[in-house]
Design a protein with these regions (language model features):
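Formylglycine-dependent sulfatase
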Residues: 2, 16-419, 423-425, 434-455, ...
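Sec-dependent N-terminal signal peptides
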Residues: 3-14
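Residues forming the ATP-binding cleft of Hanks-type serine/threonine protein kinase domains
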Residues: 431
């Protein structure tokens, strides 16, 4: 078996003529794929991420395993689903996995220099960023690690609190983990993401002669929406921002558990504030995109383009007013789907429509770099998609939040709430209803489809909890 694993890894590497490539893992925070121009956005232009997409494989059906920061990051870094490691909060996966190697640690154990800049495992934003603390980071994963402190909502500039400020009693930005927009004074290095990009470029230059695994975590567009003034130019005046189409009585067929924790109603955001929120989010994305460009330029200037696998993604998606939902957590596509781009030197650019999970990154990158793929990992190796984007490794992607579970097939989305998914349900025909306006779960015509998903969900939950961790579920 060991010989077979080595042989498969060698085949993967030889196909591209690469020997022990570097890994540059870039992750954004709270980024919806729909905000990127390479995923079809016509308003928010992201030329640097687009550049990466034009050179790599862009996945159109990639899904996170937890629809908010803590579970998602603990999952893809540990190699286990959130419920397997009992992580639905904001902690480290280390207590659950013991001495088992995380994704970065696996590379470290195999001779790679592993470095982290800013948020890879969970960090509180903005609180942890303001303080420059480690959050739920895992020291054993890294050879060296760096935090990028920034002023966040306290950055000098013109700011407004949009959430729960209908009477405008809060004259400027107040509080952090809330919908605040700040058109900030000063240059990029005032902010956490500017510092992160600069440190990443510095580390690339320092370690260019030894294989490295570099994790670069940008905190934008996570709230507060803070970016240099120049990144707001394309989105002013905010009144020109377009809100998504909405239906009257849209929530009538959505279970209570399916109503997102942030809505236009409970945030008391009128149309003006909603449009400004979209503009502030896009400005934050534009800033983050420029910082991605700086890192990619630094890699090229170091002469490492031809020996580095680059991954770009987000920890989960984000609602920008769809169904009058905002932010993350929801199990609808806007929140559960993520952008994913993998640039592999020597391969032709492609677009892959197969279902993949962030959990697949650990085994896939291990294989592509010639490392043994631990058999305990719950993700799947998708490396063959680099040469054959039509290849499929799963019939459904799986994601969770604190209230329920998602099974996402090519043509269907099934959401089950409650303990073990035995509560209320949502069922959407994604071919006929891609924006998920009509819940078919109670329609007798779809009884067979619903029954199939109920059986499938029970099997998936059993699979998640069947592992080597020795935990009681």
């Amino acid at each position: 078996m060991k010989h077979l694993l080595v042989t498969l890894a060698s085949i993967s590497l030889s196909a591209f003529g690469i020997e022990q490539p570097n890994v540059l893992f870039i992750i954004s925070d709270d980024l919806t794929a729909t905000a990127l121009s390479c995923y079809g956005n016509k308003v928010c232009q992201t030329p640097n991420i687009d550049r990466l997409a034009s050179q790599g494989t862009r996945f159109t059906k990639a899904y996170c395993q937890g629809t908010y920061c803590g579970p998602s990051r603990a999952s893809f870094m540990s190699g286990y689903y959130p419920h397997a490691i009992k992580m639905l909060g904001y902690g480290s996966p280390r207590p659950a996995i013991g001495e088992r190697a995380t994704w970065a640690q696996h590379f470290k154990n195999n001779g790679y220099h592993t470095a982290r800049v800013s948020k890879i495992f969970h960090m509180g934003v903005p609180g942890g960023i303001e303080k420059g603390t480690d959050g739920a980071d895992d020291p054993a994963s890294w050879t060296e690690r760096f935090n990028s402190a920034g002023p966040e909502w306290k950055a000098p500039g013109d700011g407004e609190t949009l959430e729960n400020n209908a009477d405008a009693r809060k004259p400027g930005p107040v509080g952090g983990n809330t919908f605040v927009v700040v058109e900030a004074d000063g240059d990029d290095l005032v902010h956490s993401d500017g510092k992160t990009a600069a440190k990443a470029v510095e580390l690339i230059k320092q370690h260019k002669d030894k294989p490295f695994f570099l994790g670069v975590g940008f905190v934008r567009p996570h709230v507060p929406f803070v970016a240099p003034r120049k990144d707001y130019t394309d989105f002013l005046p905010y009144a020109k921002m377009q809100l998504p189409p909405k239906l009257k009585e849209d929530w009538a067929d959505i279970p209570k558990a399916g109503i997102n924790y942030k809505t236009s109603k409970n945030m008391k955001m009128d149309v003006r504030r909603q449009k400004k929120a979209v503009g502030g989010y896009y400005a934050s994305v534009a800033f983050m995109d420029r910082m991605v460009g700086q890192v990619l330029d630094g890699l090229k200037e170091a002469g490492l383009d031809d020996n580095t696998i680059v991954i770009f993604t987000s920890d989960h998606g984000y609602h920008l007013g769809e169904h009058d939902f905002w932010a993350k957590v929801s199990l609808h596509d806007e929140s559960a789907a993520v952008p994913l781009i993998i640039r592999m030197p020597g391969k032709k650019p492609a677009v892959c429509h197969s279902l993949v999970e962030l959990l697949d990154l650990y085994p896939t990158l291990s294989n592509l770099c010639g490392l043994k793929v631990p058999g305990r990992l719950q993700g799947k190796d998708i490396s063959k998609m680099m040469t054959d984007p039509a290849k499929e490794v799963r019939s459904a992607a799986f994601s969770v939040n604190g209230k329920g579970f998602l099974l996402r097939e090519q043509d269907w989305a099934y959401i089950a709430y409650g303990k073990n998914g035995l509560g209320d349900e949502e069922l959407f025909d994604m071919k006929q209803d891609p924006k998920q306006f009509t819940n078919l779960a109670k329609d007798p015509k779809y009884g067979q489809t619903l029954a199939r998903f109920q059986k499938q969900m029970a099997a998936k939950l059993k699979e998640v909890r069947t592992n080597d961790l020795g935990l009681k579920y």
